[in-house]
Amino acid sequence: MKFQNVHISHQDEDKEKLLPNDKDVEKADESPSSSRPSFVFKCYVIASMTFIWTAYTLTIKYTRSTVNPDMMYSSTSVVLCAEILKLVITFAMFYKECNFDSRQFSEQVSKYYINAPRELAKMSVPSFAYALQNNLDFVGLSNLDAGLYQVTTQLKVVSTAFFMMLFLGRKFSTRRWMAITLLMFGVAFVQMNNVSASEANTKRETAENYIVGLSAVLATCVTAGFAGVYFEKMLKDGGSTPFWIRNMQMYSCGVISASIACLTDFSRISDKGFFFGYTDKVWAVVILLGVGGLYISLVMRYLDNLYKSMASAVSIILVVVLSMLIFPDIFIGMYFVLGTICVVLAVLLYNSVNE
């Protein structure tokens, strides 16, 4: 099946499948410990996140590498659309959680959302960080091949560990520090693969700038680690604010921050139009980015960052394999294979420690 055959008409149906069923979430809450959801629920979330991240990485890479620069869409407008989509979905999910009772819905929204500016301000921190991360993702994927992007972004495990020590007072065992070190070596091997690729295939023409791409990925890792730990702390602080209200607060700030980001591209947007260059595949990016953001909050609430790392590890393998089928100019050498193995082993070792 060719990648070009993806149609936006299927995206709404896929979106319904990707979102967690309320009964699944209720089962997680009703378990003896909300921090220990069922095995089936864990598998569902991990499998869904793996699919979303793989599809998102490949789709955005395809849209940025196959379109004429003069017809390129605005990445800031895509992020804004995704933030609006997240906000709409969270309102719909909370309305469903209120059993479609308009009175209860309005009372809860008024109490926890409209009349709680202090809580809204708290959630603005990870919201702005995630918005920045999403825009950096476009820069990274536009200048790196999909496989390299997926592997290097695993540095967020390092930044996450740092922020968990800084904000949550966590201490890591020797085994986990070994995993972090192994991860760093894995990334180094992947970078060596780029050097090998350029030497082995000097005729390959590419507009990809690896320095810009790697810089964007490093910045993404820092913002992702910070936002993830902060958001997890907010969702697990024992407060009375409902889960979907927390998401409303964050994504409301996300819409604001994404709108501000659009101002940096204002001249282009005003000249060509907000939706210039949008195709069915670009709308697929919007939906995947929107639903993927919701799954991040779901993982932070019912699981933790370690399960997110598992999904990333599987996604790395899928992206590398599928990239070879979709992008004919992708070079996969022994350095890349070795680096990928190191990263996967590092993530597995990191997650093997029980706390």
Swiss-Prot record:
It is a multi-pass membrane protein. Residues 9-30 have a biased composition (Basic and acidic residues). It holds the Pfam family Nuc_sug_transp. GO terms for molecular function: CMP-N-acetylneuraminate transmembrane transporter activity. The chain crosses the membrane at residues 40-60, 177-197, 211-231, 282-302, 309-329, 330-350. Residues 1-36 are annotated as: Disordered. InterPro entries: Nuc_sug_transpt. GO terms for biological process: CMP-N-acetylneuraminate transmembrane transport. The keyword Repressor does not apply. One of its GO terms (cellular component) is cortical granule. Keywords: Membrane, Sugar transport, Transmembrane, Transmembrane helix, Transport. It is found in: Membrane; Cytoplasmic granule membrane. Its main location: membrane. Belongs to the nucleotide-sugar transporter family. SLC35A subfamily. PANTHER family: NUCLEOTIDE-SUGAR TRANSMEMBRANE TRANSPORTER. This is UDP-galactose translocator 1. It comes from Caenorhabditis elegans. The gene is ugtp-1.
